[in-house]
Curated annotation (Swiss-Prot):
GO biological process: translation
Protein name stated in the entry: Large ribosomal subunit protein uL23
Compositional bias annotation for Polar residues: 158-167
Superkingdom of the organism of origin: Bacteria
Subunit description: Part of the 50S ribosomal subunit. Contacts protein L29, and trigger factor when it is bound to the ribosome.
Length: 167
């Protein structure tokens, strides 16, 4: 039997996750296979050393959906115990994604820090500009008041001169 045809796929249940921590992995295998073929297939596909293989057939079970009754298909299940120090990464697609996620999280925190720093710098510049504007406005207001006073004095002087010349 071809090595790729022996293992149909992993069985991922709550119990199988608990067994994975102790180095036991569960697979759905071809009904025609035996222990030695399963051992060779796991060692070849996952590049690990297998200590022990247990195989058993899971019988069909009756299922009801509404009024209709049916059966699940029976299948062969293999529990494969690996030698100490070996593991199988069943989630190869997710591990690089997890690394990417952690990298993006660290990049996001760095970007947030940069943004916060730029924001603080901009706020400081805005404060300086606001102070300069306030000073200039105060100077302009002072000059305006001085020019208004000077104009008032000129007008008073002109009116006094006109009054004096009229007398």
């Amino acid at each position: 039997m071809n090595v790729n045809e022996i293992i149909k796929g992993p069985i991922l249940t709550e119990k199988s996750y608990q067994l994975m921590s102790s180095g036991v992995y569960s697979f759905k295998v071809s009904p025609k296979t035996n222990r030695s073929e399963t051992k060779k297939a796991v060692e070849y596909i996952f590049n690990v050393k297998v200590e022990k293989v247990n195989i058993f057939t899971v019988p069909k079970k009756e299922k009801k959906l509404g009024k209709s009754k049916g059966f699940t298909t029976k299948y062969k299940k293999a529990l494969v115990k690996l030698m100490p120090g070996y593991t199988i990464n069943l989630f190869e697609d997710e591990s690089p994604q997890d690394q990417k996620d952690s990298e993006t999280v660290s990049e996001n925190t760095e970007e947030k820090a940069k943004i916060a720093k730029k924001k603080a710098e901009l706020e400081a510049k805005n404060k300086e500009i606001a102070e300069k504007l306030a000073k200039k406005q105060a100077e302009l207001a002072k000059k305006e008041s001085e020019t208004n006073e000077n104009q008032e004095k000129k007008i008073e002087n002109q009116t006094e001169n006109q009054e004096n010349s009229a007398k």
